[in-house]
């Protein structure tokens, strides 16, 4: 099952990861970020400053919520710090995000995927876009990463890479070549979502194709790759 949730987010500065939370500090939450939980259990955060606007929308009921909120809060803090330390300009610094969610399987052996997409305008020559995916096995109550997505000893990228290459080439009119050194590198497949019949991989500009191609995603049928270990 697939459902998309558009989420306007952060307008303002730069992507900087803040240091870890101080000992004894209250961990971040929707409320601590200044947000409210609205329809669909989505946390909505809207903040403006003299040099920026910040709007965030993310699920407030994700089973590994603290990991998701920590990531958002760290990026929010870094963004605000840079925006507040920068001079004013004609347009405010902007960061926007969307949330895409997917589920797969049937309880108790089901999974949930949340993919955050961030757009950031720092006033440079071109904005920045990146993805951050969170996947969770509701049966084992454990996060899912690419490292534990398949059984040990399998080589899933041998099957995944050719499918990703064909799908991305179909989307790219210039037909850019993806080198095997890139296409077979697991570090490029960390952001994914799981559905009943496919894996969806998300790539930042320049990760698989040239930066001018923008962010991309590729759909890989589960029937064409080794079984998932979930």
Residue ranges of predicted features:
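Hydrophobic helical h-region of N-terminal Sec-dependent signal peptides
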Residues: 6-11, 15
């Amino acid at each position: 099952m697939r459902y998309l949730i558009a989420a306007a987010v952060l307008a303002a500065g730069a992507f900087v990861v803040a240091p870890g939370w101080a000992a004894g500090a209250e961990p971040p939450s929707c409320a601590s970020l200044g947000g409210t939980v609205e329809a669909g259990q989505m946390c909505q955060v809207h903040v403006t400053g003299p040099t920026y606007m910040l709007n965030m929308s993310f699920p407030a009921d994700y089973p590994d919520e603290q990991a998701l909120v920590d990531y958002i809060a760290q990026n929010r803090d870094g963004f605000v710090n840079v925006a507040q330390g920068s001079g004013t300009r004609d347009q405010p610094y902007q960061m926007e995000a969307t949330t895409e969610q997917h589920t797969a399987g049937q309880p108790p052996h089901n999974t949930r995927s949340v993919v955050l997409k961030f757009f950031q305008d720092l006033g440079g020559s071109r904005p920045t876009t990146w993805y951050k995916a969170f996947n969770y096995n509701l049966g084992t109550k454990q996060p899912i990463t690419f490292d534990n997505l398949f059984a040990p000893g399998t080589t899933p990228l041998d099957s995944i890479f050719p499918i990703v290459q064909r799908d991305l080439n179909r989307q790219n009119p210039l037909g850019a070549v993806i080198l095997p050194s890139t296409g077979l590198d697991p570090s490029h497949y960390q952001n994914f979502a799981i559905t009943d019949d496919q894996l969806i991989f998300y790539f930042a500009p320049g990760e698989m194709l040239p930066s001018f191609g923008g962010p991309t995603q590729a759909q890989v049928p589960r029937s064409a790759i080794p079984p998932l270990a979930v």
